[in-house]
Amino acid sequence: MSGSPYASPSEADTDAMLDAVGVDRVDELFDIPPEVSFDGEFGIDAKSEQAALRGVRRRLSDNDDLTEFLGRGHYEHYVPSLVDSVSQRSEFITSYTQYQPEITQGFLQVLFEYQSLLVELTGLGVANCSMYDAATALAEAALLAKRVRAADGNRVLVPGFVRDSHVDVLRNYTSGSDVVVERYATDAGNVDLDALEAAMDADVVMVYAENPTTCGTVEEQLCAVGDLADSHDALFCLGSDPVAMSILQRPVDVGADVVVGDASVLGMPTSYGTGLGVFATRKEFLRQVPGRLVGASEDDAGTRAFTLTLQTREQHIRKERATSNICTNQAWVALRAAIHAAWLGADGLVDLAERMVELPRDLAARLDDVSGVTAPVHDDRHHIREFQARTEQPAPAVASALEAEGFGVHAVDDHTIQVCVTDANEHATDAFVAAVREVSE
């Protein structure tokens, strides 16, 4: 016996299955072009579970142990232990899609509460129960805009400061529907209204803006952006997140038709993935919403019951009529976000958001006292979580030197770094300021 926990089919089992389907060899079940097939040994030695764990831990120890001040779309907040305790219950962590509502009422109710949280924060009429991440949610918003617009058109306008990775996903995901993605100029970390107005025409189907922006600034001209979009019969899509939305103007109050973003700021640590795409929109677009919706109804006994509804995905209807061709979502991550939000409560969520205004303001003031550093770059703006700082020395060199000191920051251009501070790294701000002083003076 190998000690493996996996029971692979015996030779007799394999022969019986091949005989049942009428073939002689396993190879006959596949049609793989020779140029991409592999017929050889992998060169991987069999290991026990204990040996495999040692190898993985040894490899993980090669990672740099940095205190991150990175941000730019990925923000870590303290996640209470309650979130792990509840979300790792077997009925949650082993559940797949809730196709059998009679046995998944608990999970469905949590997802309904998650949707309700987003509806309350955005002021919009409907929110789905998650998408992959902010980038795919933005791409789905562009496709929705193209579907619902009365007139023809295919142009989508995004601010110049939006991360290249988001724009790449947007372009790639919409490439089959002739959507043209264009950037419009920004001014001092915010929308340049003159540039946006000059870019508008009858072919624009959606205008995208952020609050807070990729630069960390609070966008102060959202109503004007919404008016511009509306005057050209284009949808206004706003990017944000649940923590920031708890203290900012509600998206519906500035004219937003769609809200996208990443809700993994609640319930999840930062990592190489596992985002939580936000998608909320006006109720009139209900049947155009991508992904899944959890609805509340009644069972045969008249008791409130939850179920998946309006699943207009290609998994359920004809592909050409589907609103989305992404066939899964982030239900378990949404569950964690809902648990975290419930733990915070309305007041706690606001307190956390207000702290995210105070922390960057205080840290920027301290860095501004360092010789060779000017912070924040956008000193006439309010910031949430992050800000940009000008460095006399080349920013890439400053970022590399800080990495050697154990801190991670983004170099966003030749002489600008971006710094993010939250409740997860505020304990290290004294050491961070000292490191910046050491590498800058």
UniProtKB/Swiss-Prot annotation:
The identity of this protein, by name, is Probable glycine dehydrogenase (decarboxylating) subunit 1
Q: What Pfam family is a match for this entry?
A: GDC-P
One GO BP annotation of this record: nucleoside metabolic process
**Which source organism?**
Halobacterium salinarum (strain ATCC 700922 / JCM 11081 / NRC-1)
Superkingdom? Archaea
Cross-referenced CDD domains: GDC-P (cd00613)
Question: Hey, which family's this protein in?
Answer: Belongs to the GcvP family. N-terminal subunit subfamily.
Arranged from A to Z, the UniProt key words for this protein are: Oxidoreductase
GO molecular function, one example? Answer: glycine dehydrogenase (decarboxylating) activity
Q: Which PANTHER family match?
A: GLYCINE CLEAVAGE SYSTEM P-PROTEIN, GLYCINE DEHYDROGENASE (DECARBOXYLATING)
**Quaternary context:** The glycine cleavage system is composed of four proteins: P, T, L and H. In this organism, the P 'protein' is a heterodimer of two subunits.
Q: Which reaction does it catalyse?
A: N(6)-[(R)-lipoyl]-L-lysyl-[glycine-cleavage complex H protein] + glycine + H(+) = N(6)-[(R)-S(8)-aminomethyldihydrolipoyl]-L-lysyl-[glycine-cleavage complex H protein] + CO2
Its biological purpose is as follows: The glycine cleavage system catalyzes the degradation of glycine. The P protein binds the alpha-amino group of glycine through its pyridoxal phosphate cofactor; CO(2) is released and the remaining methylamine moiety is then transferred to the lipoamide cofactor of the H protein.
